[in-house]
């Protein structure tokens, strides 16, 4: 359903067909070709007066309320309603807003109150068939059709005359009906006001009646209560006379009891004094307990803080332990590598570990000193003493002055691996420390954990 910015006035009330003849649609085709604009011609009857918000809509056949329009166009108000040209009006629907299916539709004129004032015959939107374009008939059929057309034209004129007469009668009846409806609306309004007034008056009377009934019930109840109260007072008076005698006797008894109570009061006063002194002692004890509790709480807090500090230090020590463990594994791997290299060199020179152990000097003979960092000693010192200088070329480590045989294996690789064993690398930032600065290395790793 197509709508514009300003929607037309509609009604959700099911409408009757009593007002459909006030606007008559003329020259409505049985079908319209899709894709083209269509013009709707209509005639305003004598007693119908158009208004600014009246509109013409296209409705699908079978509609119930004026809200079911497919599209609509506002009507144009005539300048002079009394002229004949003002009664003949037209409105054009653009092809873009027209339905695209082949259902049956009809034009409906709706006033600004949402009341339908006229409806056209049904029509369709479909293309032309060949039967609609070309029709071939015989001469006799043509004559018969012409005769039939003459009869239809005559009948049409008679029907038009009858229609005009009926329209006039309908217009008169519509005017009368309009007056009656206005009178009926006036009477309904008056009746509604009277009913409202009567209802309000009735409500006031009912409220007053209920109030009177409630007051009557209250008075009756109070009267009954007063009678009961009088009986009760008389009974109380008799009882009070008897009680007075009892009270006189009771006063004497009470006097004796008072003397006895005075003696007990003195004893209780002494007991109360003792209890107050005992209470003061208890309060002092409670105060001391509170102070002890405060001291215990402070001590517990200190222990908690110490526990947290120890936990933190434990986690830091665990990190350092992991770092040192990895460094230890690295050193063990390097030591294994050096052992394998040592065995390979010994095998290359025709020596074994057992024979080499006898060649290693046990003291500082020959001006050389055993490096305490090597597990199996310096294998090259024995080789230097037992081998001729012509067989091996000896080179020294620039850090620890250890000997390396350059003719046996790659001196640069061996030297690099040897230097790695003499340094400590930080596993976090890869900073290198000499092996003799182990404490500085551990402090550096510990700083990363802070």
Swiss-Prot record:
Superkingdom as given in the UniProt entry: Eukaryota
Region listing for Interaction with LGALS8, in residue ranges: 371-381
Locus of motif LIR-like: 203-206
Coiled-coil region list: 135-349
Membrane topology: Peripheral membrane protein
Keyword terms: Autophagy, Coiled coil, Cytoplasm, Cytoplasmic vesicle, Cytoskeleton, Membrane, Metal-binding, Zinc, Zinc-finger
GO BP field: positive regulation of autophagosome maturation; xenophagy
Sequence motif CLIR, location on chain: 133-136
UniProt GO MF annotations: zinc ion binding
Region (Interaction with MYO6): 395-450
Binding site for Zn(2+): 426, 429, 444, 448
Cellular component terms per the entry's GO annotation: autophagosome; autophagosome membrane; cytoplasmic vesicle; cytoskeleton; perinuclear region of cytoplasm; PML body
Cellular compartments annotated: Cytoplasm, Perinuclear region; Cytoplasm, Cytoskeleton; Cytoplasmic vesicle, Autophagosome membrane
Zinc finger (UBZ1-type) in chain: 423-448
Principal localisation: cytoplasm
Domain characteristics, as noted in the entry: The MYO6-binding domain is required for autophagy-mediated degradation of infecting bacteria such as Salmonella typhimurium, but not for bacteria targeting to autophagosomes. The LGALS8-binding domain is essential for the recruitment to cytosol-exposed infecting bacteria.
Subunit structure: Dimer. Part of a complex consisting of CALCOCO2, TAX1BP1 and MYO6. Interacts with GEMIN4. Interacts with ATG8 family members MAP1LC3A, MAP1LC3B, GABARAP, GABARAPL1 and GABARAPL2. Interacts with ATG8 family member MAP1LC3C. Interacts with LGALS8. Interacts with TOM1; the interaction is indirect and is mediated by MYO6, which acts as a bridge between TOM1 and CALCOCO2. Interacts with AZI2.
Protein family membership: Belongs to the CALCOCO family.
Role played: Xenophagy-specific receptor required for autophagy-mediated intracellular bacteria degradation. Acts as an effector protein of galectin-sensed membrane damage that restricts the proliferation of infecting pathogens upon entry into the cytosol by targeting LGALS8-associated bacteria for autophagy. Initially orchestrates bacteria targeting to autophagosomes and subsequently ensures pathogen degradation by regulating pathogen-containing autophagosome maturation.
Protein name: Calcium-binding and coiled-coil domain-containing protein 2
Gene (UniProt): CALCOCO2
